[in-house]
Amino acid sequence: MTVEEDKALYRLFDESDASTAEGRKGTFRALMKFHSWWPETYQNLKALVSDPAHRPNFILADLLADACIDIMNEFEIPLAVHYPQMPIQMAPQKYIPGMPGAQLKHLSSEHASLWDRLREEYHVLQLIFAMKDYILFQRKMRQEMGLGPRPPPRKPDYLVLVNSFFGLEVPKDLPPLMIPIGPVLADTFQPLDTAPELLHFLHVHRRVIYVAFGSHVELPAWRVHRLIKGLCQALESGDIDGVVWAWKDRASVLKELESEVGPIAKGNIDYYAILDNKDERFKIVGWAPQRAILDQPSVCLYLSHCGASSTMEAVYHGVPVVAMPVYGDQLANGKRLEAAGVGINMDRKNFTAEELSTNIQTLVHDKQGSFARNVLRLQRIASANSRRKHVAADRIEEVMYDAELSSSDRAGKDVARRPMHLQTPDCRMSWVKANNLDLYLVYIALLAVPLGVVRWISKNWL
């Protein structure tokens, strides 16, 4: 994929919108581009594992590399898949409305009205209708490879490692093969000593907002205009006194920005001076040691797209978030941060500069102290959970032992494979048996027979 193709793909994600039919279709068009690499991935993996000299004992994959699931099923190689959030269709709970991770408003039914819950269920139908072409596209690819459909399981038959934790995620019961292991972060991070100008900026300012939208989000000129205007309003009101912005491709937006707001060096805001690092209140860098910045005491806020890593780092380092998610799991992360009381979620398509400035003011002043308490609360929970990455390594080792010794005897001869030791037995039963429906039918019959006899006696003898 070329750089331009990569940008075009993520622009397509940015243009998607769950609130409109065309926007929902745009999401699945972008996903079709992602999954168009599935045949190549599948063929290369199949060639690799078919060679005894290179056949792996275990596969660790990302959720988008779903060809690994087909390889697992075909070659019986144990698998672990990494997810940035709880998988959408696995381990569903009745108190989690709609499509988990893709809800419009409510993450759980606790504070949702009946109308809200109906709206979430209707949204699921809208998504299913929008993904029609996507489903047909996947089916055709799989047929060409000689594979049938692979419906998503309610419970996994492989190890699922979720880089998140309860407190951010809605708590729910999980099968043994699903493990929250987040936040997965390195024990150390690059210090700010390697960026002396940035370190000096953070030392001479007391209330800095850190702005970063990741490496893939394309910022259109109108959004940059509103962001800068809102940040300048917050600076002028004294809510913040500095802005650090990690933005590597800002030069490309200058011409678009000029057509958006007119001559950018005129008026109250000198956009050119800001983007060219000539405004001493702003420090715009192409790359930033993010964790080192978030760890600085002068950084009081984080304006973020809420990617998986950014969300975990913000929570771990205890920085409240002005959330402006763009696509995918970012949208759910924005809602989660707001629900946890550590941030304010904003709509990337409809926000105003005034709204941004007001939200910055709300978080900085924190009149009730609730944001500070929740930030500290969630930071401590995240710190405790960050040790669970070692549990993930232990569980991988455990699954490898089970796979190695469940299909051969002491002489190394193949025998009937034992069921996966962490898989609950209901996954290998019919739906009727797993839910005891046959047992309930027997109970009903046993109850119905004596009742029928009593009724017959009363009708014919009494």
UniProtKB/Swiss-Prot annotation:
Pathway in which this enzyme or protein is active: Mycotoxin biosynthesis
Principal cellular location given in the protein's record: membrane
Residues carrying a glycan: 350
Subcellular locations according to the entry: Membrane
Transmembrane domains' residue ranges: 437-457
Biotechnology remark: Stromemycin was found to show antibacterial activity against methicillin-resistant Staphylococcus aureus (MRSA) as well as significant protein tyrosine phosphatase 1B (PTP1B) inhibitory activity. Moreover, related O-glycosides show also significant anti-HIV activity or alpha-glucosidase inhibitory activity, as well as moderate cytotoxic activity against cancer cells and thus are promising candidates for drug discovery projects.
Pfam family, one: UDPGT
Known EC number: 2.4.1.-
Keyword Flavoprotein included in the entry's annotation: no
Membrane topology (UniProt): Single-pass membrane protein
Any GO molecular function: UDP-glycosyltransferase activity
Catalytically driven reaction(s): stromemycin aglycone + UDP-alpha-D-glucose = stromemycin + UDP + H(+)
Keyword terms of this UniProt record: Glycoprotein, Glycosyltransferase, Membrane, Transferase, Transmembrane, Transmembrane helix
Family affiliation: Belongs to the glycosyltransferase 28 family.
PANTHER family: EG:EG0003.4 PROTEIN-RELATED, FI06409P-RELATED
Protein name: UDP-glycosyltransferase
Native species: Talaromyces pinophilus (Penicillium pinophilum)
